[in-house]
Amino acid sequence: MTDYITIAIPKGRILEESVTLFGKIGINCDELLSNTRKLIFENHEQRMRYMIVRATDVPTYVEYGCADLGIVGKDTLMEQEKDLYEPLDLKFGYCRMMVAEPAGLALDDDPSSWTNIRIATKYPNVTEKYFARKGVQVEIIKLYGSIELAPLVGLSERIVDLVSTGETLRQNGLVEVETIAEITTRLIVNRASLKTKHPRITEIIEGLEKHV
């Protein structure tokens, strides 16, 4: 089955949009949306295999060659910095990676005057590099969810997190202060697979490119 193309995709909205996008280039993977606990799906007719994995694990499966292609948010790629080929911005799943703080603090706060701050985030690597470029010393507290809670209980003054509509921030009394990056979903490719399966992978990339 070495001639199969294996794609790693995370669950959730990215999975739904990916299935729709692949359908536009004749790759039928509707089975991925079925109510099942299966993690591997195979389409023998099209010689395709799909792996359902955690979003943060997609780059690892692709880097080690367990998957030829992967679909994942740019935020994960920025944080992990894997050695991967990233040929295509799929242009869905848009959000912003932001620095946010309590609205009361923001009233007379000047980010350009920051010298030593504490930040809670799921993205310690991105956060550290961002503030290092600005010459700001930062103490980073790594969290895995509900980042907005940190300023409310005094764990940190500020957070770095993804923001879509901003509604969650507003409901928790936080405001956006700085934008670190704009985030969308990306197609990633294992570098060895790009050489050994070049015709098929190139066909997929070029097909998707026409629909994004």
UniProtKB/Swiss-Prot annotation:
It holds the Pfam family HisG. It is an enzyme of class 2 (transferase). It catalyses: 1-(5-phospho-beta-D-ribosyl)-ATP + diphosphate = 5-phospho-alpha-D-ribose 1-diphosphate + ATP. GO terms for molecular function: ATP binding; ATP phosphoribosyltransferase activity. GO terms for biological process: L-histidine biosynthetic process. Pathway: Amino-acid biosynthesis; L-histidine biosynthesis; L-histidine from 5-phospho-alpha-D-ribose 1-diphosphate: step 1/9. Its EC number is 2.4.2.17. Keywords: Amino-acid biosynthesis, ATP-binding, Cytoplasm, Glycosyltransferase, Histidine biosynthesis, Nucleotide-binding, Transferase. The keyword Phosphoprotein does not apply. Catalyzes the condensation of ATP and 5-phosphoribose 1-diphosphate to form N'-(5'-phosphoribosyl)-ATP (PR-ATP). Has a crucial role in the pathway because the rate of histidine biosynthesis seems to be controlled primarily by regulation of HisG enzymatic activity. NCBIfam families: hisG. This is ATP phosphoribosyltransferase 2. The gene is hisG2.
